[in-house]
Amino acid sequence: MQKNIQNNLITWYNKNHRHFPWLETKNPYYIWISEIMLQQTTTEAVIPYYTRFIETFDTIDKLAKASLEDVYKLWEGLGYYRRAKHIHETAQFICENFHGQFPTTYKDILNLKGIGPYTAGAICSIAYGMSTPAIDGNVLRIISRLYALKDNIALAKTQKKIAQIVSELLIGYDASAFNQGLMDLGATICRPLNPQCQNCPIVSFCKAKEIGQQKVLPISIKNIKHKELNYITGIITYQDQYLMIQNPAGLLENLYGFIQYELESPYRFMEEFEKQYHLPLSLVSYHGQVKHVFTHRTWHMHIYHFSISHLCNMKLYHLEDISLLPVSTAHLKVLKHYLKQK
């Protein structure tokens, strides 16, 4: 059974694989950048970001020497900025510890900041041809259906079990084509809903299809609580300039944005702001609400325009200057909404 699975999948992949710029290279640095960008972001959306990033930082050394703000600016719009910070720190680590050359062993790659087993496996198999499994959601789904596994794929022990199955399937075969074949199969045919079994190159070996469970499997039950948060978000202006701060920590660490507090009233906002910055505000107008959804939380930002009557020590920006800053996607939404209503 196994030999037919591998031959069928690799033959199908070689004929039908999708064409993306990061698939045209064996450069581990480029593959690493693409894999990090593809986390939590759709493939089509990544293409222009990847292209710009690689054109600007075509070597690890250039990335390591860049400022974090420059890296964030190129990342702007992709979200999950912690990924960009880890990339920057990891590039510096590689320059300091590997003479600017990307590591060549699975262990060394896995030890890099921001890289987990899937990304390490993908880099090793695609760049170096190693027989290392790359287990993402697509692979978990395919293997669960192929072997009709009833285990919860959200659990680490199930993921370990599937990794072992893939490791055995890889022995003696083109690891790069096999791993990428699984990814492409999951993205285009063996999809979460309504799998296109009639087009699947390995459907004749699929136990879930055989017992009519392909739309039921895999079992995936996650215990995640999604938070709903309400903020008063302040558009604070002095004449035609805007007050923005660089977030020192948290979800939007190092990104620029408007000041906001998890409060229920703009008047409480004014009190909190004056207490923190020793500067009085005047309430000008209300501009509605903007929602921004993160993976495990949703922000409901209630937008109020405040003004300050005199110059302060805090940094103020003209609109054209804001466009040059690495601003969080959530607060770019706020600004766009405000300007539309202004």
Describe every region a protein language model picked out.
Residues 1-19, 24, 187-342:
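Intrinsically disordered, low-complexity, charged terminal extensions of DNA damage-control enzymes
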Residues 3-8, 12-196, 202-211, 278-280:
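Catalytic cores of DNA base-excision repair glycosylases
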